[in-house]
Curated annotation (Swiss-Prot):
Belongs to the bacterial ribosomal protein bS21 family. GO terms for cellular component: ribonucleoprotein complex; ribosome. HAMAP family: Ribosomal_bS21. GO terms for molecular function: structural constituent of ribosome. It comes from Endomicrobium trichonymphae. GO terms for biological process: translation. The gene is rpsU. This is Small ribosomal subunit protein bS21.
Length: 68
């Protein structure tokens, strides 16, 4: 959980900016977006497999591009 204490002489706007920065660093928004909708284990497995295939394809493309 992210918490920010307002420092002495600090405006609320500055504290809010620090809070937003901390949320970004800790990946709070990414986690919220990830958990927004439930994905069944089979869908997660398919997505992971598709991502792996994409990475392999990219790597092969890069290798063939630079080997010429």
């Amino acid at each position: 959980m992210v918490s920010v204490k307002v420092r002495e002489g600090e405006s609320i706007e500055e504290a809010i900016r620090r809070f937003k920065r901390e949320c970004e660093r800790n990946g709070v928004m990414q986690e919220i977006k990830k958990r927004e909708f439930y994905k069944t284990p089979s869908i997660l497995k398919k997505e992971k497999l598709a991502e792996t295939k994409r990475k392999i394809r990219r790597k092969m493309f890069k290798d063939s591009k630079w080997s010429k």
